[in-house]
């Protein structure tokens, strides 16, 4: 079970975007995520007449390693760690480590 999922609000812990918050848009692979408005770079794109695209400079969101983000706890207003709790019926749920409160998906 992944501890950080698509749609979670996260805080960036390291890098030039440290402290920024955003929602996870996509899990690129097992270790990388795309966070809305974070790690945006300028990409130079060549024109392609076959596809009908014009060239120029485009803002593009790049992946960030999931170890560099932490889930945002709205109760405390800070970054928090995620734990897995086993319920009585055998279901696994994600909880905030600091409060033990269940994370709403």
UniProtKB/Swiss-Prot annotation:
One of its GO terms (molecular function) is rRNA binding. Keywords: Ribonucleoprotein, Ribosomal protein, RNA-binding, rRNA-binding. Part of the 50S ribosomal subunit. GO terms for cellular component: ribonucleoprotein complex; ribosome. This is Large ribosomal subunit protein uL24. It comes from Leptothrix cholodnii (strain ATCC 51168 / LMG 8142 / SP-6) (Leptothrix discophora (strain SP-6)). The keyword RNA-binding applies. Belongs to the universal ribosomal protein uL24 family. InterPro entries: Rib_uL2_dom2, Ribosomal_uL24, Ribosomal_uL24_CS, Ribosomal_uL24_KOW, Translation_prot_SH3-like_sf. GO terms for biological process: translation.
């Amino acid at each position: 079970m992944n501890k950080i999922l698509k749609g979670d609000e996260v805080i960036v812990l390291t890098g030039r975007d440290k402290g920024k918050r955003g929602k996870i848009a996509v899990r690129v692979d097992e270790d990388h995520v795309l966070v809305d408005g974070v790690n945006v770079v300028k990409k130079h794109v060549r024109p392609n007449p076959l596809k009908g695209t014009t060239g120029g400079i485009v803002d593009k969101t790049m992946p960030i390693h999931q170890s560099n983000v932490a889930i945002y706890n709205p109760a405390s207003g800070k970054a928090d760690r995620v734990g897995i709790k086993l319920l009585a019926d055998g279901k696994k749920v994600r909880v905030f480590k600091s409060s033990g409160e269940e994370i709403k998906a």
